[in-house]
């Protein structure tokens, strides 16, 4: 029994000695702190062939969920992959360097998003087309409304699934007023400001008629921008016809085709064939860019498993875009 106790005692002292030695090393290093990242660094894009064969390529770019510059957040709010605008810019930049890439398909499933993010993606696609001369085809899946349609008109041709919902051409400002609620619980806004309209749009007060007119002027300007982008790319639409369509309503694929908002009703594989034809290709590999570690094996593979969860409009209104209390200008279908 004594030898066993002696061994245990030696083990105990060894453990204590190791801890003390480690502490001494830590103190000797000048109390340096070791930084440990909970999130692995974002790795460069990887190319995967999901269909076809040959040297020439057609790239599918996914535009799914709310269009914004907000980074996707993972567990405990930790930032995950880059925001949609940054990711699409990265994909287009990679595609522009590939001499074998001849066409791009925008696989759109979005109710829209912020005015600026929608316009930035539109601009990046336009710049890509000018730089490379490559054809771009938009294929709208379930939803391509408002900002989703804004992005789609950057394409040379727009294909919509038979069950697509599109349209919702217009601008909305998401804003809440909690003044009445605060009065009931005895809370009063005592903000100090330097100008009469400095706090316009604040949820802590009721919007005045003059403030409403100011906001309406801004929205009208953004609405005109939306119309000009459509008119520039859908030249068969007269100004009169376009304004009659752009009252915020949504359209089925059949209605959109009849009104000239899209070019064709079809499926994603038909959009791929159209892209090949537009690029003058008989055979081509269909590719997807993605981060290492994610499995992609067909043309419907998504970049993120959470893409559809971001189309929760209640979550948008109350969490993402109004959480700061400031108004948000949106090209968004938000019933």
List each language-model region with its residue ranges.
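N-terminal organellar transit peptides
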Residues: 6-138, 143-144, 155-161, 173-335
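Short gly/pro/ser/thr-enriched loop/turn and capping motifs at secondary-structure boundaries
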Residues: 145-146, 165-169
């Amino acid at each position: 029994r004594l030898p066993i106790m002696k061994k245990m005692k030696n083990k105990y002292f060894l453990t204590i000695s190791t801890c003390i030695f480690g502490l001494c090393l830590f103190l000797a290093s000048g109390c340096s702190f070791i930084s440990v990242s909970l999130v692995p660094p974002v790795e460069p894009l990887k190319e995967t062939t999901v269909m076809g064969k040959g040297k020439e390529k057609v790239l599918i770019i996914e535009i799914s969920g709310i269009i914004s510059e907000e980074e996707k957040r993972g567990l405990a709010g930790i930032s995950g992959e880059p925001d949609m605008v940054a990711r699409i810019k990265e994909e287009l930049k990679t595609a522009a360097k590939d001499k074998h890439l001849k066409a791009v398909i925008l696989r759109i499933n979005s109710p829209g998003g912020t005015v600026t993010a929608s316009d930035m993606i539109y601009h990046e696609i336009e710049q890509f087309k000018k730089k490379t001369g490559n054809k771009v085809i938009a294929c709208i899946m379930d939803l391509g409304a408002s900002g989703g349609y804004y992005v789609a008109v950057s394409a040379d041709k727009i294909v919509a699934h038979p069950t697509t919902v599109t349209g919702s051409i217009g601008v909305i400002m998401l804003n809440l007023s909690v003044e009445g609620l605060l009065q009931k619980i005895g809370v009063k806004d005592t903000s100090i400001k330097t100008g009469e309209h400095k706090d316009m749009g604040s949820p802590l007060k009721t919007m005045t008629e003059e403030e409403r007119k100011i906001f309406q002027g801004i929205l009208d300007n953004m609405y005109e921008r939306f119309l000009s982008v459509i008119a520039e790319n859908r030249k068969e639409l007269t100004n009169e016809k376009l304004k009659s369509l752009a009252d915020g309503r949504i359209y089925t694929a059949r209605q959109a085709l009849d009104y000239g908002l899209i070019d064709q009703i079809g499926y994603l594989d038909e959009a791929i064939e159209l892209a090949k034809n537009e690029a003058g290709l008989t055979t081509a590999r269909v590719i997807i860019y993605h981060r290492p570690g994610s499995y992609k094996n067909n043309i419907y593979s998504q970049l993120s498993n959470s893409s559809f969860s971001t189309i929760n409009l209640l979550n948008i209104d109350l969490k993402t875009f109004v959480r700061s209390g400031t108004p948000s200008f949106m090209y968004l279908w938000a019933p």
